[in-house]
Curated annotation (Swiss-Prot):
Coiled coil feature spans: none
Protein name: Phosphoglycolate phosphatase
UniProt GO MF annotations: metal ion binding; phosphoglycolate phosphatase activity
InterPro entries found in the cross-reference section: HAD-like_hydrolase_sf, HAD-like_sf, HAD-SF_hydro_IA, HAD_2, HAD_sf, PGP-like_dom2
Claim: Aminoacyl-tRNA synthetase is one of the keywords in the record: no
Organism, scientific name: Synechococcus elongatus (strain ATCC 33912 / PCC 7942 / FACHB-805)
Function: Specifically catalyzes the dephosphorylation of 2-phosphoglycolate.
Keyword Magnesium: yes
Transmembrane portions of the chain: none
Catalytic function, reaction form: 2-phosphoglycolate + H2O = glycolate + phosphate
GO annotation, biological process: DNA repair; glycolate biosynthetic process; reductive pentose-phosphate cycle
Length: 212
């Protein structure tokens, strides 16, 4: 094992309820239906591609909405928290001399500000932000190559089926977490190498892989 790359929203940070609230506020401007509690359960079964298609947003509208959501999410940073157990997990992983990184569709400004506020920035050797909503494959491949890591010795940890797909396409160890956006059934169908129920499960997976 050389490195572990994390998604940000829904994997490290419990930001999805805030993102949904912001997206709902912009629904009238973009012509899609706001998400209620009943819709959210259905939404967790869909890929990002399906959500965008059903919303009927053009590429220009997608970019504009993402910019608005990221800007308002930045205003909400003081209220956002790590998922329970994540801070301890990150510290333990770094103590094993593993490189830690973040690759996310969120903005660099938001990610850096949150990490600094939480006192976690020094744990990460690389932060790559602003990746496309629908596919992270190219950005993930470029990051691994730039850092000189061997794909088979790198984990990508995310909460969406698109994260699993991107990791598998690049030849990384695909790790899915069940506490984020996509539900467990959808993640199982995406066939990750590891499916985690709690942050401590990742430490167990890493321990097992490092013994091989």
């Amino acid at each position: 094992m050389q490195a572990i790359i994390f998604d940000f929203d829904g994997t490290l940070v419990d930001s999805l309820p805030t993102v949904v609230a912001i997206a709902n506020a912009h629904a009238p401007d973009f012509g899609y239906d706001p998400i209620d509690e009943r819709d959210y359960a259905q939404l967790r079964q869909w890929s990002s591609r399906t959500i965008v298609r059903r919303a009927g947003l053009s590429p220009w509208q997608q970019a504009r909405l993402l910019q608005r959501v990221q800007r308002q999410l930045g205003d909400c940073l003081p209220a956002l928290q790590l998922f329970p157990g994540v801070a301890d997990l990150l510290a333990q992983l770094r103590s094993r001399s593993l490189c830690l990184g973040i690759l996310s569709s969120n903005s660099r400004q938001n990610i850096e500000a949150f990490l600094q506020r939480q006192g976690l920035r020094s744990l990460f050797s690389v932060v790559q932000a602003g990746t496309p909503i629908l596919s992270k494959r190219r950005a993930l491949s470029q990051l691994v190559a730039r850092e000189g890591w061997q794909p088979a010795a790198v984990m990508y940890v995310g909460d969406e089926t698109r994260d699993v797909e991107a990791a598998r396409q690049v030849g990384l160890i695909a790790v899915a977490v069940t506490w984020g956006f996509n539900d467990r059934q959808s993640l199982v169908a995406a066939c990750p190498d590891w499916l985690l129920e709690t942050p401590s499960d990742l430490l167990q997976a890493v321990t097992q892989l490092m013994r091989q």
